[in-house]
């Protein structure tokens, strides 16, 4: 009996092609979010602009929020990183300055949109914290703890409370649209918050 022939298994896409598709998708998300809100963005629009199939999107990112967060972490996060040789206070000032610059730029609208969506969607709120807020909060607290251990900050300083006092004020002004929201505001905020904690 003649054996039934089966089609050969399809090979995976070349890494270069996958990288090109990934870059096109990230570009599409960024561009579309300059024109509309996170809420109004659709996976169909992203797929069409990036010239990829919807199954490709859903294979890599199961939800719209995960896709937007991926773009945010890839495109915005590198601008927030800081050198490791700074003092705790200098590191804090740099983090504050870069975050304010980012929020005043095109990424600010995207972050605000994700936070707004997270108020009614627990999964979005949790993902935003896990991928965006949490790692940066932990890194800053670690910097402040390092400064405390090195004697830069007083021994009774609570790094987590100091961090939240500073960045809580930044998010407060950012989300409510309060002025001024400038580098100078950031410098004055850090000075007021850290003045009583210097050793």
Language-model region placement:
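Basic, helix-initiating cap at the start of DNA-binding domains
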Residues: 1-49, 66
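Amphipathic alpha-helical packing segments from all-alpha helical-bundle domains
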Residues: 101-109, 113, 123-150, 160
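Amphipathic alpha-helical segments enriched in hydrophobic/aromatic and basic residues
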Residues: 33-36, 42-43, 54, 64-72, ...
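Hydrophobic alpha-helical connector segments
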Residues: 80-109
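Helix-loop "lid/cap" segments that line or gate small-molecule binding pockets
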Residues: 97-103, 111-120, 190-197
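Short, basic, alpha-helical segments at the C-terminal edge of helix-turn-helix-like DNA-binding modules
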Residues: 72-78
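Hydrophobic/aromatic-rich alpha-helical bundle segments in the mid-to-C-terminal region
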Residues: 2, 126, 130, 134, ...
């Amino acid at each position: 009996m003649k054996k039934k022939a089966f089609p050969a298994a399809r090979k995976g896409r070349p890494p270069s092609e996958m990288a090109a598709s990934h870059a096109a998708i990230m570009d599409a998300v960024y561009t579309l979010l300059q024109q509309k809100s996170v809420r109004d963005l659709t996976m169909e629009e992203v797929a069409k602009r990036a010239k990829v199939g919807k199954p490709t999107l859903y294979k890599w990112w199961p939800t719209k929020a995960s896709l937007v967060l991926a773009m945010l972490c890839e495109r915005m996060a590198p601008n927030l990183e800081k050198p490791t040789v700074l003092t705790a206070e200098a590191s804090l000032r740099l983090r504050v300055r870069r975050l304010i610059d980012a929020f005043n730029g095109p990424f600010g609208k995207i972050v605000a949109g994700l936070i707004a969506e997270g108020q009614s969607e627990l999964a979005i709120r949790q993902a935003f914290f896990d991928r965006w807020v949490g790692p940066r909060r932990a890194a800053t607290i670690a910097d402040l703890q390092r400064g405390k251990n090195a004697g830069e900050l007083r021994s009774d300083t609570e790094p987590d409370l100091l961090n939240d006092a500073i960045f809580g004020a930044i998010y407060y002004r950012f989300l409510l649209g309060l002025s001024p929201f400038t580098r100078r505001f950031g410098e004055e905020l850090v000075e007021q918050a850290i003045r009583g904690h210097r050793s």
